[in-house]
Amino acid sequence: MKEIELNSDSLEIYEKSASEKLNKKDLVDLWNLDLKNLLDISYSLKKLFNKEKIDLCSIMNAKSGVCSENCIFCSQSKHNSSKIDTYELKSKEEILKNAKSVEKYSNRFSIVVSGKSVTDLEFENIIESIEEIQNKTKLKVCVSLGLLNKDKLKALKEKNVRIHNNLETSENYFKNICTSHDYIDKIKVILEAKKMGLEMCSGGIFGMGESVADRVDLLLDLKKLDVDSVALNLLNPICGTRIYDKINSGEFIEINHTDALKSICIARIALPKKVIRLCGGREHVLKDMQKYSLYVLDGLMIGNYLTTNGQNIQSDLKMIDEMGFKQ
């Protein structure tokens, strides 16, 4: 692995980050640094807290489309007009088959469903799928099931699964991307899950027209909530979504690879001790620059995403190996 010698200014930021003494202004001001400095600071923090490993996870879109919520970025929302496959909850046999297909590569497998929440019958079937995966694979199981009540959270705690619930963006900016539910609804679920002792993965999407300050506010909320894993996504605008139209009209500017990498670095510096995982949109935004994100990250989502294709898994494994990291 490469050796880094930080200059005095970068060393000061590194030390403040390591001792978690950076405030919002400090983090926003990081945007003024060049990318190389941010990568050097981030890599130094990664080596300090999370070593040289890249943890791999995969997801399955187990129920697709016709979502009641009006998130402007989501191709599964019935308020958008994206042409995607729609289907009800997959059978436990199909879910298990999908899990087994990635077991060789992934450490975690997440069952993801569209919609604000799940019905009681869907939840019962998902619990059965969790048991199947736990009994027949070595995978750790995660679920992304929307806004869950206490009884469902308790049942998931008994199965020792990790809950995923993205905040998506800052509280201040949330109304610009969704009005059918509130930011606080997500916060309440995360707080209740943490109270019950469930592991929590949460994060957001960079590139939806938000400011750098909004990105920092999101990161500071994740820090305050003490989530276990931070899932970062880069907007891949899908035809038929309202955000796609906003980008095409020039209302929003699509995030570029430099801004994306700088944002990921700021996440590392804001949350030095957390698992930072890069998920959807990395292929679309970063392209050949993906390899540099490994200096910042602790994890990658591999395989396909919800309604878009991911990079070939073998290409990801080769990239990790060539950059000198371990799985």
Swiss-Prot record:
Q: What is this protein called?
A: Biotin synthase
Q: What is the lineage of its organism?
A: Archaea, Methanobacteriati, Methanobacteriota, Methanomada group, Methanococci
Name the residues that bind [2Fe-2S] cluster.
S110, C142, C201, R277
Annotated organism of origin: Methanococcus maripaludis (strain C7 / ATCC BAA-1331)
State the similarity comment: Belongs to the radical SAM superfamily. Biotin synthase family.
MF terms from GO for this chain are: 2 iron, 2 sulfur cluster binding; 4 iron, 4 sulfur cluster binding; biotin synthase activity; iron ion binding
Query: Where does the record place a coiled coil?
Result: none
One GO biological process term is: biotin biosynthetic process
Q: Which SMART domains match?
A: BATS (SM00876), Elp3 (SM00729)
Q: Which gene encodes it?
A: bioB
Biological or metabolic pathway of the protein: Cofactor biosynthesis; biotin biosynthesis; biotin from 7,8-diaminononanoate: step 2/2
Q: Gene3D superfamilies, per this entry?
A: Aldolase class I (3.20.20.70)
UniProt key word Metal-binding? yes
Q: Which InterPro entries match?
A: Aldolase_TIM, BATS_dom, Biotin_synth/BioAB, Biotin_synthase, Elp3/MiaA/NifB-like_rSAM, rSAM
